């Protein structure tokens, strides 16, 4: 074990639409992290800057201690607090791995796999565009695709029957296009009530989706459990959760087949590892949520590599700017699998030139229904 060092400073970087952090130690070691969710990077940055005052001069090895101190001292929790804690946790694990010269997964029980199966986001305004997007992903080697089965304006000017029929038609078209070469993953974005979720889910059973994600809001495990019980499709949910206690309620209710921890929101690698163990006890598998930057992807791969109940990894593509510019050596993607890196810590380093790029924050918005009412995003 190398001699102990102390945290010298915490750097926050608003880059494009993401919040990255670097924790600098006195011995020169720098840990990289990411935190926050779309639209809330600036408040999360403020939380990291506030927490940095506590971290200065502390030993970076005490990862769980620092998490507990900052979590318990916050009194009022939420996505801002947990997003900041997530970024700090990931960066501290990166520091520990770099100082010991090993990947993070080696510090969390060791590697359980050499590569990580990914599902690719596909989409399109029309059914034909959606089908072609799915076929393109399969041609690139992906064995799972994820999509929302309706156009952006479905909730504005259509009856439930009309857009549900359209959803069934689109799911069927994608299934026919990819056949047995790829699994299909259906994302609903919390747009339905429980009864509607059950009705549509039953209609989609014929296409054998890998999962049926967030058909309703995830804030009622009991109601989600009713959907899970009455649909013969695996439910996936949990991307909005910020603590292990929310996952505990979900799992105890038998409300899901797959949990979707967001490492940049629910407490970083530490809490995601705990949640994965909780899920393992229930024979529930893990599909990490990952809509952010390649730093988030790198953290997800470290988790995926060391848990036995990993199922799939969300992947939005990182071959185009600005994402392709962020890392000096990007993670290697081969036939729809991310290869588990062997380098220390997260196994990545940031490209300083790319970091000079401007902030491009996501604009907060949510749909307005045909009657003028606010809809969920």
Regions found by a protein language model. Give the residues of each.
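Shared catalytic-loop signature of beta/alpha-barrel
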Residues: 49-53, 65, 202, 208-211, ...
């Amino acid at each position: 074990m190398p001699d102990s060092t102390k945290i010298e400073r915490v750097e926050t970087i608003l880059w494009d639409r993401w919040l990255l952090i670097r924790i600098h130690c006195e011995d020169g070691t720098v840990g990289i992290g990411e935190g926050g969710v779309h639209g809330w990077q600036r408040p999360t940055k403020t939380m990291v800057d506030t927490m940095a005052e506590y971290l200065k001069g502390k030993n970076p090895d005490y990862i769980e201690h620092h998490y507990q101190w900052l979590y318990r001292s916050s009194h009022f929790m939420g996505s801002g607090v947990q997003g900041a804690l997530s970024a700090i946790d990931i960066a501290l694990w990166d520091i520990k791995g770099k100082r010991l010269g090993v990947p993070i997964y080696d510090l969390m029980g060791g590697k359980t796999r050499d590569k990580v199966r990914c599902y690719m986001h596909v989409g399109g305004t029309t059914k034909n565009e959606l089908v072609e997007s799915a076929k393109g992903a399969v041609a690139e080697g992906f064995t799972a695709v994820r999509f929302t089965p309706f156009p952006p304006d479905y909730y504005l000017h259509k009856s439930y029957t009309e857009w549900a029929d359209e959803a069934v038609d689109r799911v069927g078209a994608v299934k026919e296009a990819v056949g047995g070469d790829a699994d299909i993953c259906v994302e609903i974005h919390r747009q339905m009530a429980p009864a509607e979720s059950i009705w549509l889910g039953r209609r989609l059973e014929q296409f054998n989706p890998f999962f049926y994600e967030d058909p309703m809001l995830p804030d009622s495990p009991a109601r989600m459990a009713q959907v899970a019980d009455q649909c013969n499709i695996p439910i996936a949910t949990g991307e909005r959760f910020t603590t292990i206690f929310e996952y505990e309620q979900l799992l105890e209710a038998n409300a899901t087949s797959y949990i979707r921890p967001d490492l940049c929101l629910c407490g970083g690698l530490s809490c995601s590892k705990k949640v994965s163990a909780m899920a393992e006890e229930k024979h529930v598998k893990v599909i990490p949520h990952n809509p952010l930057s390649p730093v988030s992807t790198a953290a997800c791969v470290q988790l995926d590599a060391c848990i036995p109940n990993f199922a799939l990894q969300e992947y939005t593509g990182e071959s185009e700017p600005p994402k392709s510019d962020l890392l000096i050596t990007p993670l290697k993607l081969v036939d729809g699998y991310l290869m588990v890196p062997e380098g220390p810590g997260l196994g990545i380093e940031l490209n300083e030139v790319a970091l000079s790029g401007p902030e491009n924050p996501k604009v907060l918005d949510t749909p307005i229904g045909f009657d003028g009412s606010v809809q969920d995003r």
